[in-house]
Swiss-Prot record:
Binding site for ATP: 8-15
Ribosomal protein in keyword set: no
Binding site for GTP: 59-62
Protein name: Nucleotide-binding protein TERTU_3824
Keyword Acyltransferase attributed: no
GO MF annotations in UniProt: ATP binding; GTP binding
Taxonomic lineage from the root: Bacteria, Pseudomonadati, Pseudomonadota, Gammaproteobacteria, Cellvibrionales
Family recorded in the similarity comment: Belongs to the RapZ-like family.
Membrane spanning stretches: none
Stated role: Displays ATPase and GTPase activities.
Keywords assigned: ATP-binding, GTP-binding, Nucleotide-binding
Length: 292
């Protein structure tokens, strides 16, 4: 049996996640009262269906808001730890406010005495036990609908089919750190193609920039050091029942060096892991994860 607990703040994409998982063959149950979870797990674990896959949505609308008991209920049940996973979707307060303003939907915790700001904060506190216990946290603040579906498919569905998922994400430090990174490597010390007028408008995906960086000794040293580090430590995470890993590579603008290094490292690790992808945050047409 495969059990996914899907949770997150309203407006962060939980419904989208459940719809995608349903399309992928999961039986989805939204807003299940926590107290009913043990009985459901018991029933499903003894089902005649071969390897049932179930996704359960749990959020702050729950009849019993004491969600701190959720993990204890699962842990004392019949499922081994590797059979279930907690997925938590979140967004920044500013993004949630904007989304509610655009859709003009009412927040589920809003009432005549609670404004939207207070409802969002109250929901964060209620869901804290789940967010703290999450195996996978997806920040959807900068994701559109297509990108969110791609991220869920990569992090959750992809790991079902192909073992551990590894994502290399390039970014520009001037635009902020990726909040979902497990490792961050800074390649700003490497020679910068930006200062070559002929390369400035090209990206790290272009043959000209690749040729420029391939010829630099520092680039080779950085590449080999990161690759050696990842090959040593990724198996340790995998042995600890980790299903995904996000490795962020940053340069100043996120357009040349970080893109080049992410692509090259992903290509090398593809020999060891089937589900290796890249995402280049500062290149708009490559925002969805791509197989290397």
């Amino acid at each position: 049996m495969r059990l996914l607990i899907i949770s997150g703040r309203s407006g962060s994409g939980k419904t989208t996640a459940l719809h995608l998982l349903e399309d992928e063959g999961y039986t989805c149950i939204d807003n299940l009262p926590v107290d009913l979870l043990p009985a459901l797990i018991e029933q499903l674990s003894t089902s005649d269906r071969p390897s049932p896959r179930v996704a359960i949505g749990i959020d702050a609308r729950n009849i019993n808001n004491d969600l701190s008991r959720l993990m204890a209920m699962i842990e004392v049940g019949p499922l081994p730890r590797e059979s279930y996973q907690v997925i938590y979707l979140d967004s920044s307060r500013e993004v949630l406010l904007k989304r509610y303003s655009e859709t003009r939907r009412k927040h589920p915790l809003s009432d005549g005495l609670t404004d939207l700001n207070e409802a969002i904060e109250r929901e964060r506190i209620i869901l804290e036990p789940i967010s703290n216990a999450a195996d996978v946290t997806i920040d959807t603040s900068q994701l559109n609908l297509h990108e969110l579906r791609s991220a869920i498919k990569y992090l959750v569905v992809g790991s079902d089919r192909e073992g551990m998922a590894v994502l290399f994400k390039s970014f520009g430090f001037k635009y902020g750190l990726p909040v979902d990174a497990d490792f961050v490597f800074d390649v700003r010390c490497l020679p910068n193609p930006y200062w070559d007028a002929g390369l400035r408008k090209l990206s790290g995906l272009s043959p000209e920039v690749i040729a420029f960086l391939n010829g630099e000794e520092q680039v080779e040293e950085m590449y080999n050091d990161i690759l050696t580090f990842m090959r040593k430590w990724i198996p340790r995470f995998e042995n600890n029942n980790r299903s995904y890993l996000t490795i962020a590579i940053g340069c100043t603008g996120g357009f040349h060096r970080s893109v080049y290094m992410s692509e090259r490292l992903a290509k090398a690790l593809k020999a060891d892991y089937k589900n290796v992808q890249t995402r280049h945050r500062q290149i708009p047409d490559s925002s969805a994860p791509k197989h290397s």
